[in-house]
Amino acid sequence: MPRSNDPAEPQSESADLFAEPSSQHSSMRSGSEQVAGNMSPRSTSSASALQYGSEMGSVSQMSSASTLRRGGPRGDLGIAAVDHRTVQIRGMEDEMAGDDGQPRLYVWGTRICVADVQRSFRDFLTTFKISQLAEDENMMTGHDEALHEIDVNHPYYMERLLECNDAEVTHINLNLKHLNAFSEALYRKVIAYPADVIPYLDIVVNEVFAERFNRTLAQSIELRPFNAQKTRNMRGLNPNDVDQLITISGMVTRTSSLIPEMRSGYFQCAVCAFGIESEVDKGRIEEPVVCTNCSNTHCFQLVHNRSVFLDKQVVKLQESPDDMPSGETPHTVSVYAHGSLVESVQPGDRITVTGIFRATGMKVNPKQRALASVYRTSIDALHFRKMDTSRLHQDNGETITEERIQQIIELSKRPDIMDALAQSIAPSIYEHDDVKRGLLCLLFGGTRKDDETTNKTKLRSEINILLCGDPGTSKSQMLQYVYRLLPRSQYTSGKGSSAVGLTASVSRDADTKQLVLQTGALVLADNGVCCIDEFDKMNESARSVLHEVMEQQTLSIAKAGIICQLNARASVLAAANPVDSKWNRNKTIVENITLPHTLLSRFDLIFLIVDAQDEMQDRRLGNHLVSLYFENDGNQEKTEHVDMNLLRDYIAYAKANIHPKLSEEASQFIIEKYLFMRKAGAQHGQITAYPRQLESLIRLSEAHAKIRLSQEVSVDDVEKAFTLWREALKQSAVDPSTGRVDVAILASGMSASGRKAVEAMCEAVLKQLKTAKGFVTSKALFHTLKSADKTCQREVFDEAINELSKKESIARSGDRIRFQTEA
């Protein structure tokens, strides 16, 4: 815009965005000077819309002669009143005026005529029709508070006004793509000057509502624009976007408590009790200096209970992993939610925010008015569009169409649906069919049983899986695939994870100076999957927090006076390597990966992935790996996989709509299988099943029913789940000395045969110590037992000594041992 000291400066680019007739600056300037008292809105650099919020920008230029209806202030727009920053130009000086010669209202510093904007938007509301609607836009709430489909033969936004009348809804979501299709000029005005234009659009909406229904709601209807074409990622935000309408996507990492923000202050004179209301603009409130009633100065006091406050919440939005360059730290931005938008998002939600990008000056010294050259940026939210928790890694938030649902139902009727979907899990990884079936069950999950009305114990539906084995067997690749597939998933490495990073940390908020709880990976992965790589390298303090999460699905916090219990209903998918970088088949799983047995027993499936030496297997694997880098002429057969997008929609639809329950036949069959496993181990003095294994079998059976899109678990589902569960046990819970399955390895860390060997060693040690006089060194005692029995092992001997020491059957003094006589 030309300034008074530089008349030759060209007009700003923002003024050319709108399809309006051109006008001479001198005419507008003379008209505005005539009304505003010789102060031209263009005579200062602060009149630009991009610098809105400065001291000059907070001066209202609305003439008292305006006959336009006023609307209520909106906290999310950061303005004091609807007539903020407007100027009235009389007909003689207004080249864009009509034949009536009446004065018209313009947004200060622009060529945006308020009457033209309102007329165009009224036409849009009353005439705009669209046949293709997204699924989250084609439903409306009726008198009975039930959802009804919108009639596309009527104007779309008039149907939305009908919803406001029937269901007492006080907001309308404005799809800016609809506005752009109707009038590109009006769309650009909303994008460039949202704080100035949207309040007048609110007036039009309320006027049209009153004309059609002959009533007014208790609260004014507000517009919530979304789906702007000017969508930016956080790294793309720049000074050109300040005070403009933007749309960005990200993940919510933290939400503050509700903050009461003053919108209107009531000041009362301490001498004569005369009251004056003062509007708050951009967080600033001007205290009256002189009382107009008694003429005293500096005598006003703020009365809080007569002031107007508005709910406010600070939402920390973090850059989405899809938009983040590799090796970079994620960017964050503060989003301010006002009014009905507060408490609408939770940490871990992936959302799309439409709002006004703000830049606020920071003081060099809190006691001085001087501002630093660096400004703090934030976003005043106008609309939150939350991605459904059952949706998978899509940023547009669109739901599944009817055509896609029919395609999903047709796919579920295939007899080999389990194998077809399993082969589509990480198709570039060769074989590992059982592991892929287990991952498929993890993606679908079981049926949640948390009905509080029945006073029953809550049982988890999430399935936990551990992948262990030799390095280079695609364990991390499978974790990465699952992480990219699910919406509320978190990926972390055991070496770089701490207990605070997994659970929650307490920090002091920079704005409110209060202690706040910052949630970690397990809480952010609520209703999703937490992928933990290098599980064996995680320190003990970080690993100990998983015990409660993997069974109770909650996380108890007691830090710095903050005591709470957070939901962590997340499936845990972990990968671990053996101790010596090579799996030793002569050792149990507890000895190979040095994980506590209390944690191992909480995994539903433990898969052992070993790099076996087999020439034919190596040749097939080599051909598969080479085919990933070299494309042949199509001579080799290609396996048809389910399309990735179809697989995502299939899982989302099943998790949202299918909740299978056990049938009578399936219940009896599960009990028979459980008793069969118990009896099979009892013959050899081993335990092959615990109640936790029974619950795992039920969850796996429910997951198989979900894969078929069945609301009932059949006997065939139980049979397939039992086969998968048995194959996993054969790999992970086999006693190396006997070759039989022994679940006691997972439950107690030692097999039944190992327990018997330790008990026999305890008897031999006590027999030797009873005949010895005084203390005997453990080395000499072991050599004595070794000479009598060549099969004696040092590990069994040490375990026996520890057991006897716990029972206080022996007395130890360093390396010396003696028999403990009874008192």
Swiss-Prot record:
Molecular functions per Gene Ontology: ATP binding; ATP hydrolysis activity; DNA helicase activity; single-stranded DNA binding; zinc ion binding
Taxonomic lineage: Eukaryota, Metazoa, Ecdysozoa, Nematoda, Chromadorea
Further comment: Early fractionation of eukaryotic MCM proteins yielded a variety of dimeric, trimeric and tetrameric complexes with unclear biological significance. Specifically a MCM467 subcomplex is shown to have in vitro helicase activity which is inhibited by the MCM2 subunit. The MCM2-7 hexamer is the proposed physiological active complex.
Protein source organism: Caenorhabditis elegans
Job description of the protein: Acts as a component of the mcm2-7 complex (mcm complex) which is the putative replicative helicase essential for 'once per cell cycle' DNA replication initiation and elongation in eukaryotic cells. Core component of CDC45-MCM-GINS (CMG) helicase, the molecular machine that unwinds template DNA during replication, and around which the replisome is built.
Keyword Magnesium included in the entry's annotation: no
The protein's Enzyme Commission number: 3.6.4.12
Tissue: Expressed in dividing cells with some protein being retained in quiescent cells (at protein level).
Enzyme class: hydrolase
Annotated region described as Disordered, given as residue ranges: 1-77
Name of the protein described by the UniProt record: DNA replication licensing factor mcm-4
Family: Belongs to the MCM family.
Principal location class: nucleus
Binding site for ATP 1: K456, R602, R692, E695
Composition bias, Polar residues: 21-67
GO CC annotations on file: chromosome; MCM complex; nucleus
GO biological process: one example: mitotic DNA replication initiation
UniProt keyword Nucleotide-binding, yes or no: yes
InterPro entries: AAA+_ATPase, MCM, MCM_4, MCM_CS, MCM_dom, MCM_lid, MCM_N, MCM_OB
Protein residues bound to ATP 2: Y430, K475, S476, N577
Keywords tagged on the record: ATP-binding, Cell cycle, Chromosome, DNA replication, DNA-binding, Helicase, Hydrolase, Metal-binding, Nucleotide-binding, Nucleus, Zinc, Zinc-finger
Gene3D superfamilies with a match to the protein in the record: 2.20.28.10, mini-chromosome maintenance (MCM) complex, chain A, domain 1, Nucleic acid-binding proteins, P-loop containing nucleotide triphosphate hydrolases
UniProt xrefs under Pfam families: MCM, MCM4_WHD, MCM_lid, MCM_N, MCM_OB
